[in-house]
Structure formats: structure tokens, C-alpha cells
Amino acid sequence: MAKKKGEEQDFEEEPNFDDPEGFVDDVSDEELLGDFLRQKPCESDGVENVIVVDNIPVVGAARFPKLKGIIEKIFKNAGTIVNVHYPKDEEDNTKGYAFVEYKNQESAEEAVKSLNNYRLDKHYTLLVNRFADFQKYSDIPKEWSPPQPQPYKVQNDLYNFLLEADAQDQFCVVSETVPGSVQVQFCQNTQPEPTELLKRERFTDTYVKWSPKGTYIVTFHKQGVVVWGGSSFVKVNKFAHSNAQFVDISPCEQYLVTYGPNGQKIVIWDIRTGAEKRTFVSDGMSNASMLRWSHDDRYVARLVDSQIQIYDTTTFFLLDMKSIRVEGIRNFSWSPTDNIIAYWVAEEVDVPAKVTLMAIPKKTELRTKNLFNVADCKIHWQKSGDYLCVKVDRFSKSKKEKKDKKDSDVKFLGMFYNFEIFHMREKDIPVDSVEVKETILAFAWEPVGSKFSIIHGEPSSANVSFYETNKGQEPVLVKKLEKKVCGHLFWSPRGQFIVLANLQMGTFEFVDTNDFSIMKTGDHYRASEVEWDPTGRYVVTGTSGKAKEDQGYYMWSFQGRILKRVNLKNFMLFLWRPRPPTLLSDAKQKEILKNLKKYYSQFESKDRLRMTRASKELIEKRAKLREQFTEYRSKRVKEWEDQKKRRMQLRNNVDTDTLEADPDNVEEEIVEILVREDTTVIE
């Protein structure tokens, strides 16, 4: 209510905001105004965005525009360039260095990281440094003070898995426990039951991958990939590459390649140091953009615009500073044991297709094979590098079918197939040819040996042919298995044994190629993968993916006997841990095989002891489970008996615990079921 004019008004006393006597403010400006103070200008602003590029060519005014275009084209890949300054002398010549200013500090740091030691040509290698580093290095104190000694860090033994006394292999099982949570279980393949070594929840976001020799395992995450190793799988290194889709590891495990999504970069890393060695731009994840390694990690190559680009991994520069240009090249592949590249060139008008073997680093052509009427080629190296097979899809005639006014498709008619076999260990590399008229469904080399197998014909009734290749002789057909319903071939890594698989029906045939006897047949409904262990003793078939029922894996012996069935909900992947090549010489291996019989008694004795111990443990385990069940059942029976009075009250004092207790409420009904119907024809 308003007061009249002249009346005294009452106001509340204002609070006192003064600090009490002796008050000490312990809140710093950084805590109070942190966001604001971070925007405060400083002396290094602008300088952090500048880099210095040394060792650029010294040119005059006439050649300066070309030099400027080349330098700016190289450095714009690191970020947005604001300004480039080229100091010049009195005669208008450049002084051999330049200053490049980027939009932000991150771009400048990326330029230093990725373009330092960039090979401009065979005479000039660019040296890139941050401009701010000059001040840092000029402030180095004159008196040297020794660094503080760091405590010794015990390194994890990355090869511990090879010290297992009985040479039992390891494997990992990947499954999704809950949506978005992937579990990885590591096991030792002991008999009769595997031994769990480690189980990791949320170990990866998608899947895992072993390195070629089994030293490392790679996990995938949103921020990048992580490499693990050692007996307890500790972190060895992590590599920041957002949304990396998959990885590749070099044969000798020195380098890791991460592939980003379509249109993003491909990065080569040093596994041990974590250093970024080289980056490439992806062309949409086509097969041609994949990097391919030589057997010794010395070279890495890729196919770009009718050129094979081979990089020497000692510097990660192009070999001889230039690409190998091959017009019409379609694909290439390294030998698994030698620095030899095999590539094929498509057929042109009046120019035949050809397959060429080239030795690296000399780039000399070792062998060329001309081919006619070629639609496509597939290159298959034998694991030992002794043979190369080029599967050639050939046609009798072709015709063009127009898609629109500009484009047209080529349709091939009268298809037949040739297998060109190159004998790599013989003088002048002779080539033999095997012709097959029927459709080829699969091809596979025996990893250790001289045989190869082919599935040909109609999928519903195919034939499986086995050929033997010997030195100085043409391939010989040694066996033909007719009317087989299969589409995949899986050789044992030790040779001799092979699995003929039909993954659509889930049927498998185990064949011994010494006498081509079918040892066993089996089935695993909806099996989608087949994995041999490194020793060739066991085979695993797995069901995952779209199959919602019966997910899990079966383990078989090499003879086709099922050893165990494991049903696992949301099973994703089963992977054997690879092993490195043996250190024993061929002579030593032959000596061991020769004297193997005298070791049989030792092995059999050890196996019996292990099985006896395992049986005893299994009996004890079952007895313990039986005891637990009996105890649990006794408790439940006692509880049920104690509740009888309450049940009687609920049922009008009628005992319904047994059928005989209340016969008036029991109805007897006879049901007839037709079990079998036999029909006898009387003449």
C-alpha cells in the first residue's frame, strides 16, 4: 500500500558486502576467469602458426612462379595457408628458404610432422621447422645438467606364448555380451577341455585381428586402434586414427597400416615406436588402393593410375624416386618369399594381354607371358613361393552392349579358363598351361607341397580336380572327385589334408590327398567360417552373423571327428593365434621326422597321463556339481514340505500333491498316436 506524501517510509537495511576483517581471498584469477584469460593476446600469437621451409631450390624471377606453385601445392595438404613469403636477394633470386603462415597452430604442427624431410626431387629434400623453435633452441643454457635417471621399466615378454612346453596353440573367441559390449576370451587349446587364459569385457568396439606371426593383437575403437601383447595382453601402443575401419600388419610385424573411412587417409605406423611413417589419401577403399608388402618389410607398394608406386621403408620415399608406369595394368601381387612382383596388363586392340614378373629393386623383367582373348586374370602365389598360378578367364568372342549414348558394356561369350603355372625355382621360369572348359568355382594351392586343387562345373554337382606339379614336368591330373556339392577349399597349413566345404548347406568333407580317401563327412548348419590351427591338427567351423539360432563353433580333428560343440549366444569370431616360422633348418626337420618313431612312446605316455589327470579332474568336478545339486534339491524339498499346510488351506483341505490323493478329480484319457504305417504289396 502506497504511503501519502510526507509520511515517513520504512526501508529494509541493505546487506553488508564488505569482506570481514582479516579475510584472505584464496581464489586465483585463473580459476575465476579461466575462459576469459585464455583469450588474452600473447607474444607468440601468429608466430605459432608459421613454419620455416629450408633447402628449397634457388631460382630466378623466370622460374619463381613454377616453384611457388609446387611449394604451395605440397604444403596446402596440411591446412589452409594464409601467406607464403620467399626472401630474395638483390638479383631477385630466392635464398633457398621460405616462411609459410597457416590459419591455425594445428595446421603448422601437422606440416612439420608430415612434410619434414619431404623429397622434392633427387637433389632437394625439404627441412621443415616451427618458427617458434628458433627461440627455444637459442635459449639453451650454456651449462649442461645431466637428466634425472628414470626407473627401469620391466618390458613384457611378447613371445611368451611360444614357450608352452606341449606346443598347445592359443585362440580367441569374440562375442557380444550386451549390445555395444564386445567380449574377447583367450584360451589355450588343452585337451579334453580348453583352458581359459584371460577374459576381457569391452576389449574392442567391433572385432580383433592377430598380427601375421601372432606377436600382437589389434583392437578397434572410435578414436583409433590399440596394439596389445605379452602373456597378459598389456597395451604395447595406440594409434590415433578416428573411425579406422580395418588394419593391415606387415609380414615381419614392423609396420601397421590403418585405413580410414571412404575419402580419408591411410596411415603407415611404426608398431614399436608409434611414429607415423607415411600417409596416403584413400580412393574410396577399392582393392587397388590397398598397400601391399614385400615378404621382408623392405618395400610397400600400391597401384595408382596405371602406375606401381614402390616405397623403400628405410626412407619411405619412392624407389629410385619414380613410379613404374605400366599402361593398362589391372593388378599386381608380391611373392610371399622373394622380392618379385607379378602383374597383369589388360588386352588392347592388336595388343595381347600379358603377365610379367619383375625383380625388385632392379626393376628387371624376369619373365613375360602373352595371353589372348582375356576377360580377367587372378594371381595366386603358392605360400612357399615355388610356384605362381595365374587364372585366366578367356572368351571365344565378345560384343558391346550399349548402356546409353556414351557408355557401353562388353559382353563375353564362350567362356573357358586357363591356369598358367610359373615354375619360379627353375631356370628361365618355364610356364605350363592347364585348360578347363567348365566354370571355375574355387582354386587353392597346397601351402606346403606341389599340388593345387580346382572346383569346376555347376555348383549343385561340381567336380574337384587335384593336379601335381613337378620340376621339369607339366602339371598332371592325379585325382578327380566327381559330383561334389561344395564351393570352397581349405588346405591344412601343413599340406596333405584338405576340407571341401559347402558353406550354404554347412557340409564338410575331409580328404587325405596322399591316397585321396574321404576320411569323414560332417555338417555344421549355417557355418560361415572355417579356420585351421597353425599346426594342421584341428579345424574350427563357426556360425555367426545373421544366424540368430545355434550360434557358436565346432572343433574338429584333421580327420573330421567332432571334438567339441560350443553354443555361444551372439558369437562373432573365432581366431587361432598364428605362429612364426620355425627356426629349424630343413635338414634338422628331416632328421626329426626320420627319428620320430622313438619319440612316440614319450608322447603317448604324456598323453595318457594328461588324459588321466583330466579325467580325474572331470570326475571331481562332476562330483562337486552333483553334491551342490543334491544340497540345493534337499533345501527346496524341505521348503515344499513345510508349505504343505498352507497348500491344504488354499485347496479346501484337499491334498493335491499326488494323483492318488484325490481320485475324484482325476480323468483318464486314452490317446492313440500313429507311430508307423507299413504297406505290403500282395501280388
Curated annotation (Swiss-Prot):
It comes from the Eukaryota. SUPFAM superfamilies: RNA-binding domain, RBD, Tricorn protease domain 2. GO terms for molecular function: RNA binding; translation initiation factor activity; translation initiation factor binding. GO terms for cellular component: eukaryotic 43S preinitiation complex; eukaryotic 48S preinitiation complex; eukaryotic translation initiation factor 3 complex. It is found in: Cytoplasm. SMART domains: RRM (SM00360). Belongs to the eIF-3 subunit B family. This is Eukaryotic translation initiation factor 3 subunit B.
